[in-house]
């Protein structure tokens, strides 16, 4: 019988009985072994195989060869006294072999059904190799593009992170009766994305109220959706390292949310509490983690080396150890590992790169690409454009195109823009390729002259620029979020040839693009689009596909605006569009009277707001209409709006619903995303679109730290981005 992974079902009673039966037979050493996760970064290890056979390892990570995985699994199943199988884990972040767009790009699709499909396909490829848990999705709210790991999540908005996170959990985990069910480990718990200065691993200082209103809801939603595992974060928040935060791991996660999966640390995070100055040594760190509610220790060896001694000293209890083992065993039983511990080596040879998976990756790359700006040059007309120069360091860089966390992706299977343009349009258009700059970090060389000469002879320049894959992701934060090397100088030189320039940016974060806007005729932002990014971009450029992506994070004008995000609180002196610095008189008299919360040299608005994205047509929205103006606590708000495609091309619009609570017991955001819909319209077509918003979705943690809806007045918008739309008023009583 099928059941959604992680949900209570008729199978759960049987799982619990099996857990208790097995637990009753285990020695202390066998129990501790289940809580120890080891890495295989250096390839096959006979030492690890011996440790497994001795019952000292419960989980492994960083191995993807099914034959090696089976060798280790055989040691666990056939050589240990109780035959408990290993849980094999890996970072399957945005695809396994077939790479989908990076998660930040997937968030730009605003298409949770597509994201769920991609996660399901990634699970099917990975489980064929014997991998049964992925450290994904990342649910960290990220408002600082300097932080490298912004690439791995769904951006700055809580609701979007909830929706996309749940889609990934459901996609990975599938059904309990299916051996392609791969457990989801949601991460990083919590506030890791709020690292000071955008510097990875740095401290955070997020208050409990802000945690509950912004950072925790995506985790709660994924726990309710059945996520089997959760990973603690590297950071300390308010002075407490996450792997020692009992309030979050026990009071919130277990007691409030009812989580019954297992908690694992991030890489070596237990031992790193020594570096934090929070633990004296690894033994002390293990004590802190166990007492806080961490079940599995990733590679620190704190549990395997010290738990027995800590138990003898009374610093941890047998009840704590038993509960941790229960949580691990429960997941192993739910996954069916005891019935199906081994990878199918023959199946693994043909499990990846199926046509349907490649097509889903292409569609995902299409939908994740955001048309930031267009002076009318796009889409290109094959009947008018005869010669195209393809240039830039990302035009034919298959590995870089895949993006961060592509360890199992294969550059040889990646279709680049250059290849796709030649394959799809080479019979109609002359394609000239001169890279100009070979790498995103390179300085200008002799190749630039060749590219400029070709640009002068072309009808259009297609410039592909951006970031290397390694420039985003873990441990890859930046102080300057601009195109690196001589890319800007090269772009300027291309633009000065007078030939129209279409710039496509592949990057793991939002970049500063003011210079690029001044030196291009259109900008497509595809983040890192994955294996099938080339065909997607080629089809978008020539109009066989239309852009529909929306920015999942605000794009700052400069690093000085960071953090800039749409759902900030209102200040006592809100921005009114007053005079900026470059309009001041040199002899102006010093005064602070009448000032507002604004940057004098750049205003308040970002370069591109959250939810922004153009297409090859235009849409017109009516003012929203509500079914009533007053609502009770148990009501659902019905809002409808008319939307018209006022252009001459069929296209898809992501309609976004925002709400503002005008007065609260604590200050509230100026807007909050509460819903969205993807709507496709023919040229000239008008549709009436309805949204249903339960009043209870307006609840928040106020001054009394209780989640509830506060009666009062609200505004509601339905628009194409977070910075537009006409508000309509309603009240809740």
What is each PLM-predicted segment?
Residues 726-730:
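Edge beta-strands of extracellular beta-sandwich domains
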Residues 2-700, 708-722, 733:
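Glycoside hydrolase catalytic-domain context in secreted enzymes
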